[in-house]
């Protein structure tokens, strides 16, 4: 006799990256877009607001949320105190200045009479790095008597306004002059130095500037480098690598054998490629004309496979959502396009690379284009087609999906493109909801942080390319088992999903279910 396996009715967590809530209509791509599907879901089903920024997600008060932080909190089911908060606290306590990873880099530079290079995103954004950390490193180098200290400044323009760098670089230059002898040696937009999508031609441009002093442009000082980039029509993110020269027209500094590097970005995803280029012996992604042997320190753990000193190693999170589902023997799927794949896997699993038993992963490639305003739908339709097939397969108990569009297109600052991105996601959510209803599944639809709801700076009327600190909506879609949801935080999502699955939440999860009893 043939026994048929009963098809599962999946519980979905659909994360609409960058889908924030803001009442004002000006510069609000979410309100400007036609969103019949999301509008219908909000009218017909229970929903609430979730805090997705500041202390609610383990960041300093008022600090905007981001995708890494959002997914960590969602998966952990508790407030996860972020690296930004941990590092700020260590500076206040004084532990920062005794950190063995930093002191190792400094000892190496002093022992070899070599240079200490401080490399990373010069920004107040607080997403990848923070200006106070750079200041603390400069003070530490001065305190320890390092003679040759050079800064390789990557410019932001995404998590802060597109032309914030000139003021920030002027301020950093002044700080260097007042606190020792550090000098800015190179400038590069994050588009080049911090690529994460294996566009190695971009990484190579930054690497060559750092190791050979070879770059598209050279200027006598950092402020001129930024000013001239603005004249060329480049905003901070896209400033081409520029080498700062000394009085003889030679590069102020290049990274050489026996030098020390401290990469002060604390977020891993955009620090990996450049790190690999420096430290991987078998690196084949582009030819390295110079490969200096350096003492390399990472601010946080960029890659589990690299044996490098880490200033702030990860704190282990136990009993995160994926682990709890796995222990219950449930089949789970994580699906996203390239831009957010790490978020639904690595970050949702508490910052761990490992895949849990019963966890499948599906990566849909993001389109290979210069900027996503050129294709606001990105790969959302392909993600949708794939996930619909997976829903109909009846294989999965839980599916976690991320749509990247509202965030990635929001970062371009181009309003019309962001509107199209919102509409593409709305269309995809509608298709998924239809299929879920057919198979008897349910969904929680929410976001990890805001972005597309504010595409314009209301004061300056310039494009707003950063995340926001606005709340996000959370919708329950499915049967009438849930009568209402109460307002909460991102860390309340995992306990809510576990309640829907009738699984007791582990004691490590301090978040509360959003379901109104």
Curated annotation (Swiss-Prot):
It comes from the Archaea. This is 2,3-bisphosphoglycerate-independent phosphoglycerate mutase 1. Catalyzes the interconversion of 2-phosphoglycerate and 3-phosphoglycerate. Substrate binds at residues 128, 158-159, 190, 196, 267-270, 340. Keywords: Glycolysis, Isomerase, Manganese, Metal-binding. Its EC number is 5.4.2.12. GO terms for cellular component: cytoplasm. PANTHER family: 2,3-BISPHOSPHOGLYCERATE-INDEPENDENT PHOSPHOGLYCERATE MUTASE. It comes from Methanosarcina barkeri (strain Fusaro / DSM 804). One of its GO terms (molecular function) is phosphoglycerate mutase activity. Its cofactor is Mn(2+). Binds 2 manganese ions per subunit. The gene is gpmI1. The keyword Electron transport does not apply. Transmembrane segments: none annotated. It catalyses: (2R)-2-phosphoglycerate = (2R)-3-phosphoglycerate. GO terms for biological process: glucose catabolic process; glycolytic process.
């Amino acid at each position: 006799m043939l026994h048929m396996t009963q098809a599962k009715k999946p519980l979905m967590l659909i994360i609409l990256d960058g889908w924030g809530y803001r009442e004002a209509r000006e510069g609000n791509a979410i309100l400007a877009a036609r969103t019949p599907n999301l509008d219908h879901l909000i009218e017909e089903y229970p929903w609430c607001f979730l805090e997705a920024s500041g202390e609610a997600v383990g960041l300093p008060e008022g600090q905007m949320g981001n995708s890494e932080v959002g997914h960590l909190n969602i998966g952990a089911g508790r407030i996860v105190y972020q690296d930004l908060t941990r590092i700020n606290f260590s500076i206040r306590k004084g532990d920062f200045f005794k950190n063995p990873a930093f002191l190792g880099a400094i000892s190496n530079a002093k022992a070899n009479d070599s240079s200490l290079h401080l490399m990373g995103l010069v920004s107040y954004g607080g997403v990848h790095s923070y200006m106070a950390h750079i200041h603390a490193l400069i003070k530490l180098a001065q305190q320890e008597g390092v003679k040759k200290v050079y800064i390789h400044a990557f410019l932001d323009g995404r998590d802060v306004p597109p032309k914030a760098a000139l003021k920030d670089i002027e301020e950093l230059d002044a700080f260097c002059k007042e606190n020792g002898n550090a000098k800015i040696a190179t400038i590069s937009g994050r588009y080049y130095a911090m690529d994460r999508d294996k566009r190695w031609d971009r990484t190579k441009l930054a690497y060559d500037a750092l190791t050979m002093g070879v770059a598209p442009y050279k200027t006598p000082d950092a402020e001129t480098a930024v000013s001239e980039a603005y004249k060329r029509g480049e905003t901070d993110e896209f400033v081409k690598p520029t080498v700062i020269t000394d009085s003889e027209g030679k590069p102020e500094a290049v990274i050489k054998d026996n030098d020390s590097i401290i990469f002060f970005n604390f977020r891993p995803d955009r620090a990996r490629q450049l790190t690999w280029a420096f430290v991987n012996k078998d690196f084949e992604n582009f030819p390295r004309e110079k490969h200096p042997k350096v003492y390399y320190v990472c601010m946080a753990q960029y890659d589990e496979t690299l044996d490098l000193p880490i200033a702030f190693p990860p704190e282990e999170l136990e009993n995160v959502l994926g682990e709890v589902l796995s222990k219950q023997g449930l089949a789970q799927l994580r699906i996203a396009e390239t831009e957010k794949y790490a978020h639904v896997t690595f970050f949702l699993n508490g910052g761990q690379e490992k895949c849990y038993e019963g966890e499948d992963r599906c990566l849909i490639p993001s389109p290979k284009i210069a900027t996503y305003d050129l294709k606001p739908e990105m790969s959302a339709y392909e993600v949708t087609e794939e996930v619909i097939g997976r829903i109909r397969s009846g294989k999965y108990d839980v599916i976690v999906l991320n749509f990247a569009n509202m965030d990635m297109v929001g970062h371009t600052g181009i309003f019309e493109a962001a509107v199209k991105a919102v509409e593409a996601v709305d269309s995809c959510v509608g298709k998924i909801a239809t299929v879920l209803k057919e198979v008897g599944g349910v969904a929680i639809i929410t976001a990890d942080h805001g972005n597309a709801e504010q595409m314009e700076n209301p004061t300056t009327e310039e494009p707003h390319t950063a995340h926001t600190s606005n709340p996000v909506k959370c919708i329950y879609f499915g049967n009438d088992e849930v009568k209402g949801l109460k307002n909460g935080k991102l860390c309340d999502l995992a306990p809510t999903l576990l309640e829907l699955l009738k699984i007791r939440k582990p004691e490590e999860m301090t978040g509360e279910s959003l379901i109104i009893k």
